[in-house]
Swiss-Prot record:
The active site is at H96 (electrophile), E166 (proton acceptor). CDD domains: TIM (cd00311). Triosephosphate isomerase is an extremely efficient metabolic enzyme that catalyzes the interconversion between dihydroxyacetone phosphate (DHAP) and D-glyceraldehyde-3-phosphate (G3P) in glycolysis and gluconeogenesis. Belongs to the triosephosphate isomerase family. It is found in: Cytoplasm. It catalyses: dihydroxyacetone phosphate = methylglyoxal + phosphate; D-glyceraldehyde 3-phosphate = dihydroxyacetone phosphate. This is Triosephosphate isomerase. The gene is Tpi1.
Length: 249
């Protein structure tokens, strides 16, 4: 019997919001029904991690959107996993396509960050995904498997890892992978984990989808057997995020 994977919904607020509007969003989330079978995590901008943790109901966890690969030091503008934990956050998003493509983070650096964050006791939402030209060239699998390998090489305990598949061409573009496209990649990723890690990890690791997820698209995506939740961008700042949290209901 395959283990039941708890549905996981992450809200990535990116570089958005001020205390007033985020406070209003938090009030909406605190009043929302969060199903017992769903884990919800919100990732505010670094400046608002403490604010979000103090205001959010304990049923919703808090994540950082990034961290560095060491504990302390002369790294201007960076934040360490220890600092993130000190603020009450328990997760970190690593390898997001915007970190890869806007800020030039390499697979190697992302792997080092994953290793350090896990060693420090944070849960990791590890992001992978292909660009449009890579999908059109037919190398989606090659790209996401290479990205996954670097992450896997740095993971000792998979119970603290959620894999987020985000086709880069679907992020912030309004284009969503079809449920069938998402399922196909998720199924292949689970197969990769089975072949390259082990069957237990493949069965228990949650693989979530990111890329223009909305209240309108979430239910059909959530019905796919290998889609274990979502990493939501723009829609996580709107009341429809509550609909996405309840996509399995």
């Amino acid at each position: 019997m395959a283990p039941t994977r708890k549905f996981f919904v992450g809200g990535n607020w990116k570089m958005n919001g001020r205390k007033k509007c985020l406070g209003e969003l938090i009030c909406t989330l605190n009043a929302a029904n969060v199903p017992a079978g769903t884990e919800v995590v919100c990732a505010p901008p670094t400046a608002y991690i403490d604010f979000a943790r103090q205001k959010l109901d304990p049923k919703i966890a808090v994540a950082a959107q990034n961290c560095y690969k060491v504990t302390n030091g002369a790294f201007t503008g960076e934040i360490s996993p220890g600092m993130i934990k000190d603020l009450g956050a328990t997760w970190v998003v690593l390898g997001h396509s915007e970190r890869r493509h806007v800020f030039g983070e390499s697979d190697e650096l992302i792997g080092q960050k994953v290793s350090h964050a896990l060693a420090e006791g944070l849960g990791v939402i590890a992001c992978i995904g292909e660009k449009l030209d890579e999908r059109e060239a037919g190398i989606t699998e090659k790209v996401v498997f290479e990205q996954t390998k670097v992450i896997a090489d740095n993971v000792k305990d998979w119970s603290k890892v959620v894999l987020a598949y985000e086709p880069v061409w679907a992020i912030g573009t309004g284009k969503t992978a079809t449920p069938q496209q998402a399922q196909e990649v998720h199924e292949k990723l689970r197969g990769w984990l089975k072949s390259n890690v082990n069957d237990g990890v493949a069965q228990s690791t949650r693989i979530i989808y990111g890329g223009s997820v909305t209240g309108a698209t979430c239910k059909e995506l959530a019905s796919q057997p290998d889609v274990d939740g979502f990493l939501v961008g723009g829609a996580s700042l709107k009341p429809e995020f509550v609909d996405i949290i309840n996509a399995k209901q």
